[in-house]
Amino acid sequence: MMKTVEEQMAVIQRGAEEILVEKELIEKLKKGKPLKIKAGFDPTAPDLHLGHTVLINKLRQFQDLGHEILFLIGDFTAMIGDPTGKSATRPPLSEEDVLKNAETYKEQVFKILDPAKTKVVFNSEWMSKLSAADMIKLAGTTTVARMLERNDFGERYQSNTPIAIHEFLYPLVQGYDSVALDSDIELGGTDQKFNLLMGRTLQQHYGKEAQCTLTMPILEGLDGVQKMSKSLNNYIGIKDAPNDMFGKVMSVSDELMWRYFELLSFESLETIAGYKDAVANGENPRNIKIKLALELIERFHDKESAEAALKDFETRFSKNAIPDEMPEFTFNEVMPLANLLKEAGLVSSTSDGHRMVKQGAVKLNGEKVTDSRAPVENCEQQVYQVGKRKFARITVAA
């Protein structure tokens, strides 16, 4: 038996940024029938991170309320390239890459969604059947002026940055997906609002009942400033090793921890409020953060892995111990320390290496080093550490 409309709305509203139009959503729920809930993901990279799961978690909530989940893999749109938030044309992917990435998506999302209650669809199923005439008719449903209302398009137009015609097609294709699927609600990030509303417009144009839209916040990365992104290296990947996932969660600020609880945890709001009260009354935020780390690792791995990661964390970080196992490297040439750190994968670039040394975040056998340009000559099995979580055993035989 489905929950009351009021009970469902309480779940739906949790963490949501905006619901359009809320009155229409309530009327849809009053019908007492499972609604079609759509969310699209372009398989532009093989691995998902926790930022992606904000939407997937909301899909799971709808699923638990008894609604039908349409997990749309945008294999067709991925070959266009989503221009949302981009200051330049985004290169499209090959069909081979798209299909390969799509397979990994299915494997990863079912760590959250119930596969038996999830319908996975590919928008190439209907988009590849449209003729040139059909695409021209679709393009005729909107205007260039409407497209330029989108912030990114408008800014690029004002700055004389080229906008390719195929980029205008992206929101139209995403909107047409809603027509093809007869979706009742579409979910997306706040940066997708224009595209979601295009779905409403096109459904009305084709004589269908307009979908409601629900936007979720963009999750900040580990730095607490920019959106979580693999390219910014401020992400926690779904496929990260348990120990890495644990360490990354523990590295977030105490303030950001509550944001992660709200958007990533399946704990009730009452439970989270209890955690906040505990911290306000003197509980160490670290203890609460551990609960979040354990929950996420258990979700994406298993309980045993979560417990092992906690034990490793306590050994490695709480006691400032150097782990027994770490990557080992042998180099046959003398190079400056910053370059060595980059070659060993301890930093993302030599400039990052210089910066980390300057910040006092680099240690050699437990002792801080201060000269990032000092040449590293013949040495054997020296332990280098960057930050709290990165270690490597390095030999230089020049």
Swiss-Prot record:
ATP binds at K230. It catalyses: tRNA(Tyr) + L-tyrosine + ATP = L-tyrosyl-tRNA(Tyr) + AMP + diphosphate + H(+). One of its GO terms (biological process) is tyrosyl-tRNA aminoacylation. Its main location: cytoplasm. The keyword Manganese does not apply. SMART domains: S4. Its EC number is 6.1.1.1. InterPro entries: aa-tRNA-synth_I_CS (IPR001412), aa-tRNA-synth_Ic (IPR002305), Rossmann-like_a/b/a_fold (IPR014729), S4_RNA-bd (IPR002942), S4_RNA-bd_sf (IPR036986), Tyr-tRNA-ligase (IPR002307), Tyr-tRNA-ligase_bac-type (IPR024088), Tyr-tRNA-ligase_bac_2 (IPR024108). A motif ('KMSKS' region) lies at residues 227-231. Residues 335-396 form the S4 RNA-binding domain. GO terms for molecular function: ATP binding; RNA binding; tyrosine-tRNA ligase activity. Homodimer. Belongs to the class-I aminoacyl-tRNA synthetase family. TyrS type 2 subfamily. NCBIfam families: tyrS (TIGR00234). This is Tyrosine--tRNA ligase. The lineage of its organism: Bacteria, Pseudomonadati, Pseudomonadota, Gammaproteobacteria, Thiotrichales.
